[in-house]
Amino acid sequence: VVGEDRHHFAQVLLFLIDELKITIQGRKVKVFSLARIPDSDEENEIFKDCAVVYFLQSEENRWSECTLCDKKGVLAIGEGSKYAREGACVSIVKSRNRVKLLINREGYASRNLKVSSRLLRLRSAVDLYKKGG
């Protein structure tokens, strides 16, 4: 989780992962929280085993500086529609007091990731980002 975490998102996420005993391919999920995007020389060490990066709203003007976002196999998620417009895989946006996912298929493809067809069928909670639209 990268950015100014005023609502303690990282803590809540860690709590849910621990309570639900969530693993990925049998491996324990770790949650790290950074107040800002690290400098490029720090980035490789900090994110070396990272599979998902969640950017908070405070980083929407800087997130593309993070070279990790170009790494194959890393899912980039951001709070706010700007992230999907600028190449992230998923933006999380509020619409009519509901949370929606804005999916950028090109963002997935550029990182060698695939979007689940089950996720795409959730039309009430998912929109596809289209360039120019």
Model-flagged regions — what are they?
Residues V1-G133:
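Short hydrophobic alpha-helices and adjacent helix-cap/hinge residues
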